[in-house]
Design a protein with these regions (language model features):
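Aromatic-rich peripheral "rim/lid" segments of glycoside hydrolase catalytic domains that contact
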Residues: 111, 118, 406-425
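N-terminal Lys/Arg-rich, disordered targeting/topogenic segments
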Residues: 1-26
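Solvent-exposed loop/turn segments at secondary-structure junctions
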Residues: 82-86, 104-108, 147, 153-158, ...
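Substrate-binding surface in catalytic domains of secreted glycosidases
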Residues: 78, 112-128, 174, 195-343
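Surface-exposed amphipathic alpha-helices with a cationic face
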Residues: 65-70, 134-148, 152-153, 207-226, ...
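Conserved, mostly hydrophobic/aromatic
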Residues: 99, 190, 253, 304, ...
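Glycan-binding loop/region signatures in secreted carbohydrate-active enzymes
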Residues: 48-66, 115, 306-392, 419-423
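Glycan-recognition patch characteristic of GH18 chitinases/ENGases
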Residues: 38-178, 416
């Protein structure tokens, strides 16, 4: 049997050992160069989108290439709370300028909380570091939007102790800048909710802290926007917020214009009535909130908070939209949050038992709950009420809107369609 022909045999016979080594070296160098060139896009993508793997990022890039970001005439923000992250699959990132994670809580020493009061893992911190959040951040950035983070202190004593400590403020500012740079964030939202009247010195302390936060962000994370949340009565009862002094360091003010009536209210009522305060039908309303704030702020500094939810109360009389609420108990039932999606899919929130309140620009329904036999009244948001709020924000020439919360509309496209009709150029 003939010996197989070696194609390199003649070359090997004529090459000296030194030349063989030189050729092998060149081949190896060539392979290394090719591998380096091939790896450059990998590491570049990893640099651009550090919260997810390059392979996922490439798949997101391919997906959003055919779904370009819409050209919007206003900012369209959406809050993504950690407890809603499994409901984000249907959000339209092409219609959102900003997605803001809610939230990392802070203790009175300025540390981002990793444990709660029961020494359990803090759910906000846990979710912040898990794949669903990291992937949402990358998707937002790839789709053409900005990813943001809410830093929250919701306890009066913690707010007081924090603001009275320079070292606590430094701790939080340092940690915030670290998170911004680590995840390529472009927006920090401060949510300091002090209830009641704070000690006189705290407002000045909050202003000074906000100034320091803005200075550090500008220095160490250039281009990062700093926003703060305001409450519905902040225009006339400023509490912690020296609004006119804050204008120089705060880019925009997100107004939480909802929860005018809550699960703890004595009676049923609209979560965000557009009107009704002047006639005393409602204790306060959205129009009055912004009328007050526009005396202190230019419209282009204001972001209008938009609720995608309402509440469903056990009440004394289902025929009265402002009926007194029954004490919450197993016998009477409990107040429930009623998201747009749930109201949309449940027939008892769309029948003859429902009416649209023209003053509040919000629907309500009265019905009897079969399991308890008790009357209930639900106030919630539907497409008509959301459209009224979007149009109000546009007509007032506000900087934009902020949805509370993303995912409350489930897979229904209605509100995305209205947002597109209202804010796409």
């Amino acid at each position: 049997m003939d010996k197989p022909i070696d194609p390199f045999e003649s070359i090997n016979r004529h090459l000296a050992p030194s030349k063989k080594k030189s050729l092998l070296k060149k081949v190896l160098i060539g392979i290394v160069v090719i591998l380096i060139l091939l790896s450059i896009p990998y590491f570049w993508i990893q640099h651009l989108y550090p919260t997810t793997s390059p392979f996922k990022a490439i798949s997101y890039l391919n997906y959003y290439r055919s779904r370009p970001h819409q050209d919007l005439n206003k900012s369209t923000m959406g809050f993504a709370p950690y407890w809603q992250l499994d409901k984000m699959q249907d959000i339209r990132l092409d219609l959102l300028t900003d997605v803001i994670y809610f939230s990392l809580t802070v203790d009175d020493q300025g540390n981002i909380a990793k444990k709660n009061a029961k020494s359990e893992d803090d759910p906000g911190w846990v979710a912040w570091n898990q794949a669903p959040t990291n992937d949402l951040i990358a998707k937002t950035q790839i789709a053409g939007g900005r990813a943001g983070l809410t830093i929250a202190i919701l306890d009066n004593d913690k707010i007081k102790n924090f603001l009275l400590s320079d070292s606590s403020q430094t701790n939080l500012i340092t940690s915030t800048v670290k998170e911004v740079n680590k995840k390529h964030l472009k927006l920090i939202n401060l949510d300091f909710e002090y209830t009641g009247e704070p000690p006189e010195e705290l407002a000045g302390k909050f202003t000074a802290f906000t100034n320091k936060m803005k200075q550090e962000l500008s220095s160490k994370a250039p281009g990062t926007e700093l926003d703060i949340n305001l409450m519905v009565r902040s225009g006339r009862d400023p509490g912690l917020f020296e609004i006119e002094k804050l204008k120089s360091s705060v880019d925009r003010f997100i107004v939480m214009s909802y929860d005018y009536y809550t699960s703890g209210s004595d009676s049923a009522g609209p979560v965000a009535p557009m009107n009704g305060a002047a006639s005393k039908k409602y204790f306060f309303d959205v129009t009055t909130t912004y009328s007050d704030l526009l005396k202190l702020l230019p419209a282009d500094k204001i972001i209008m908070g938009i609720p995608y939810y309402g509440y469903d109360w056990p009440v004394e009389d289902k025929s009265d939209p402002r009926s007194l609420a029954l004490p919450q108990s197993d016998a009477n039932g409990y107040v429930e949050t009623l998201s747009y999606g749930r109201a949309r899919e449940d027939q008892k929130f769309s029948g003859d038992n429902c009416q649209f309140d023209e003053l509040a620009q919000t629907p309500w329904c009265g019905y009897t709950e079969p399991t308890t036999g008790k009357d209930r009244v639900a106030w919630f948001e539907n497409a008509q009420s959301i459209k009224a709020k979007y149009n109000y924000a546009k007509n007032q020439n506000f900087s934009g809107i902020a949805i509370w919360t993303l995912g409350y509309d489930k897979a229904y496209p209605d509100l995305w369609d209205i947002l597109k009709q209202t804010f796409v150029k």
